[in-house]
UniProtKB/Swiss-Prot annotation:
It comes from the Bacteria. GO terms for cellular component: phycobilisome; plasma membrane-derived thylakoid membrane. This is Allophycocyanin alpha-B chain. It comes from Mastigocladus laminosus. Pfam families: Phycobilisome. Contains one covalently linked bilin chromophore. Keywords: Antenna complex, Bile pigment, Chromophore, Electron transport, Membrane, Photosynthesis, Phycobilisome, Thylakoid, Transport. Heterodimer of an alpha and a beta chain.
Amino acid sequence: TVVSQVILKADDELRYPSSGELKSITEFLQTGEQRVRIAQ
């Protein structure tokens, strides 16, 4: 998922996620309900 990809990339580079990466996680989490509805 987007969340694990962002965390793993930052971890590999020995840094915290950037503000842009954190924003992409936030957007991913905010659209979760919509993705679940589509999947049903």
